[in-house]
Amino acid sequence: VYITGSSEKTWSSPLNAHAGGFDTFIAKLNNSGIRQWHTFMGGSDHDNGKGIAIDGSDNIYIAGYSYATWGSPINAFAGYFDAFVVKLNSSGTRQWHTFMGGSSWDYGKSIAVDGSGNIYVAGYSNRTWGSPVNAHSGNVEAFSVKLNGNGALQWNTFMGSDDSDYGKAI
């Protein structure tokens, strides 16, 4: 059993230290609910894990959003709030992470992994970014993203009206 979210302070003995502000946390529980490990990731400001998926090799994928850059991402932080994806191995060690978004706010809310190791994220943005299949056309647009197993962006697309549209699950 895995859980993700955000925490304002450190607790217990994490694999990776709390950096400050709100950090994303990931915890592994056994079948009896006993925590096996937990780790933090993020920068000195607001980082929030919102979605979690596990692949056939027990790798853990987290989707969320960050207010500042951290670590050495595949794709750089672009500004304000950016969506992110993090891949951890089954022991909780970060394998890679990447940011997705533009100069305004972009929120990753949900994540899924297919049998070939491709990663899909749903979320929402209030500005365009990348080279989308369908252009951003409104105030807030739902988005979907496909990353390959190494975290490289394969495509992104926007959908919705000229008002507010929110992608929250995939």
PLM features: what roles do these ranges have?
Residues 1-170:
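A sequence-level/structural motif corresponding to short, flexible coil/turn segments enriched
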